[in-house]
Design a protein with these regions (language model features):
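Mid-to-C-terminal "cap/lid" subdomains and adjacent gly/pro-rich loops that border
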Residues: 1-67, 78-79, 109-110, 114-121, ...
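A Trp-anchored, charged/polar loop motif used as the substrate-binding/catalytic surface
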Residues: 68-72
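C-terminal structured subdomain/cap of oxidoreductase catalytic cores
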Residues: 73-132, 167-260
């Protein structure tokens, strides 16, 4: 492929990305706590997606675990999680173990879990209407009862009609979805905020001049300092942080305020 300069070498296998937001009836169906979170954080901001979706032209898993074939994977993830984990040092040495907890699905009202459950159902409806749909890979789906309308269809002749009725999920199906999500959730590669800029009493690590609280002569200027996630690729955010950090440091070297 290198010798013939195959164009595939410049392809990341992701041809489609999208931002997804639920309809008003879908929000209401997720319960009053979800409705409250939606009204507070999303309803008046139409550019803020509930979920981000990347359609990848491969199987996002161990290829040795499935038969050879052509696969498409829909990756769903939230850019605005409510759950919070933690990462703390436990001693002064570089090899002292970290106190680390990812904190998946630990938010008070299970908003993150409800987001993922809604997203699973939504992306499934989208993909089974695409022209290339020829079935579902059981390894990438919850274990529904064979008698359930939600049961995986491993081989079909083509997509369902655009106006086909959506799959109806029972309480048993929802429990299967929840279990599958809890067992398979992972972190994507845009994580940030582990040393967020905020007041110390609000669990902040750095102040507005990038100084680490309680440490003299140490600044942080990378993607760990944003106080919350951003709804997109993080390259531009990193560049802005770097530019602003340069201004702060240059000003301090010239004798300006800001050095602790």
């Amino acid at each position: 492929m290198l010798a013939r300069k195959d164009p595939m070498l410049g392809w990341n296998a992701i041809d489609i990305c999208s931002k997804l937001r639920p309809t008003a009836p879908e929000v209401a169906a997720l319960g009053p706590e979800f409705q409250g979170a939606w009204d507070r954080d999303f309803a008046d901001n139409p550019n803020r997606p509930l979920m981000l979706c990347g359609v990848v032209s491969c199987f996002l898993g161990d290829p040795a675990s499935i038969p050879e074939g052509q696969y498409v994977t829909s990756g769903m993830y939230t850019a605005y999680p409510y759950s919070r984990g933690h990462m703390h040092i436990t001693g002064p040495k570089h090899d002292d173990p970290l106190d680390f907890d990812v904190g998946f699905f630990t938010d008070k009202d299970d908003i993150d879990l409800k987001k993922q459950m809604w997203a699973y159902k939504k992306q499934r409806e989208i993909l089974r209407r695409t022209n290339y749909f020829r079935g579902e890979l059981a390894a990438g789906h919850p274990k529904f009862a064979k008698s359930s309308p939600a049961a995986v269809q491993e081989e079909v002749s083509g997509p369902v009609p655009k106006d086909a009725k959506n799959i109806v999920y029972s309480e048993e199906d929802d429990r299967a979805i929840e279990q599958w999500i809890r067992e398979n959730v992972q972190t994507t590669w845009h994580s940030l905020g582990t040393c967020k800029m905020a007041e110390r009493e609000k669990d902040g690590v750095v102040d507005s001049k990038l100084n680490v609280y309680g440490v003299t002569g140490l600044k942080i200027a990378d993607l760990s300092i944003p106080p919350e996630n951003v709804g997109g690729n993080t390259n531009n955010t990193a560049l802005v942080i770097g530019e602003k950090a340069a201004d702060i440091i240059i000003n301090e070297l010239r004798g300006g305020a800001g050095t602790p």
